[in-house]
Amino acid sequence: AVIGFGEAGSCLCQGWGRSDVRAFDIKQIDDTNIAADKTRQMQDARVSIGDDAASTVREADMIFSTVTADQAHAAARAVAAGIGQGAYFFDLNSCAPSTKQKNAAIITEAGGHYVDVAVMATITPKYHQTAMLVAGEHAEAAIALMLALDMKPVHVPGPVGRASTIKMIRSVLVKGIEALTAECFSAATIAGVADEVAASLDASQTKDGWKDQAAYNMERMTTHGIRRAAEMREVAITLADLNIAGRMTAGTIAWQDQLGNLGLSLLDTEGLEPRLSAIHTALDAQKGD
């Protein structure tokens, strides 16, 4: 069973290509504007459509939770009402270790086997074969099940939260660089020095040019900023649990959230300047409102 049929959940189902998967997404009942699209996506993926989380997982031996980070705890509670004894609950959500430990307590009390899973790359290129870290008491048995589904799990020895810790701390840099890029190139473009700044940065690296990277980062933030901001709030919890002040992370949350809430698609807009122009036009329109 799959709980949450956004990008991750739908990609898993497409990658598996199985007809014995049952799926549910809370937007089927909470958002009438999206419900029809969710139903159509599930039909296209050839999965059975559940009516709610509890009934969707009731007969499932394996349950994959792929909701947004801010809904992960609620999803665990909802699944606990229907999970079978000994069923495996794979928590793929981008959550703080302490959040996953709370989720584990709920699933364990309900009789399920909780598995901490961290998805370590964008899921679209490789779908179900995307690299994933797996931790917790049931990790080894869970990995055997994942391998049977042609997935690519890697065991991280340690308790629930260990895999998530690696991802959360990595995200400080990955999502932080995106936010810094937005801040840097917004200022550089407004100041009329984007080419000079990019050239200076290009001279210090050997991979893709910084303007290309900045254009890519902008698209990622407008497309996935809301979800990434939710993940970064969990990163902030992770840092707080480690007694580290997440000053940069706070700024990252603000940038990801702001651009994600623009409702802007940049997939058909090529290049840094056109993408920044679209972003700042949308931001100016918000100010006018």
Regions found by a protein language model. Name each.
Residues 1-58:
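NAD(P)+-binding Rossmann beta1-loop-alpha1 motif at the extreme N-terminus of oxidoreductases
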Residues 3, 95-175:
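Rossmann-fold dinucleotide-binding core
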Residues 16, 42-43, 107-108, 146, ...:
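A generic structural signal for well-ordered alpha-helical segments
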Residues 18, 46, 60, 86, ...:
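Short, well-ordered alpha-helix to beta-strand connector turns
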Residues 53-114:
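Rossmann-fold NAD(P) dinucleotide-binding segment
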Residues 166-272:
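Helical "substrate-binding/catalytic lid" subdomain
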Residues 269-289:
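Short, basic/aromatic-enriched C-terminal tail that caps enzymatic domains
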